[in-house]
């Protein structure tokens, strides 16, 4: 998955990260507006480090190398999995999809999605189109 864009809806204030696969599959991760604004600054130029940046720094300081972020579904909910290497062994931790996007952006990590995550995203997009079919238009985040 490639990060297509990060937006904040002018109408409702919701934020979202649009991820697109090579096959055209689209996944939108809802972000709170503050996180969306933080992540939309490509260079991370803020006076205060984010928690994600601290976490990535601590991984490096402890000899842990982050690998990739994988979006998956568990119990009908989207989640992100961060893989990393510790002492030559692969390990995985789960986090929220929002945290996964932050890790992707700030850690310059590759992202993937399971077939279940893509199907989940497609079904959510279909419901969003049904409920917000009015003046929202194609750029509406929700």
Could you say what each language-model-derived stretch is?
Residues 1-142:
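Divalent-cation
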